[in-house]
């Protein structure tokens, strides 16, 4: 899917089970403990409006519960893993999507508004208020009915690099959890304002974290690290 000219938004999604080299690479890396597998939507398909604006999959789709189940099954069959975390396509998730991952008991890489949480389960209001009292807020693990949430920052060519560094510094002072998401096909792309590659910026951020004494853990361990 990284070759956007050839594969981006194809009409028929191609299951990961048909990509044998990728399955082999991922399987070996999982055994070595080098990576974790998360569910990132089902096919990442956008709805294109007449004005050409794009609506992300977990906003516009109505069959999200079945899509989550099918996605979990595909990853289980392909890699032998039971995924526990969900990353919304385009970092966007609506109320239906939130209900779907809650039912599947998948933790969310991202945060949602209190109103959506309450519509899924009114008890979530109490959890949301409690989370705000955490010393690490907003960089703490937020626990709700059926799932947890962790804030996730994006590093892409158009990301605000100075804001990302500022957020990292705030997180460091609060001893919170800092997660950065990026795309492998953008690794060699230059940042719009910094004029350095995304790889260079990511390595710079990792170096800053290492120098500050940060502990590097996987997402699953981060979710288990604390309670809000």
Question: What does each model-identified segment do?
Answer:
Residues 185-189:
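Short acidic, S/G/P-rich loop/turn micro-motifs used as interaction or catalytic elements
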Residues 1-85, 91-142, 161-180, 191-228:
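Catalytic alpha-helical scaffold of carbohydrate-active enzymes acting on polysaccharides/glycoconjugates
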Residues 141-162:
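Acidic/glycine-enriched edge-of-secondary-structure segments
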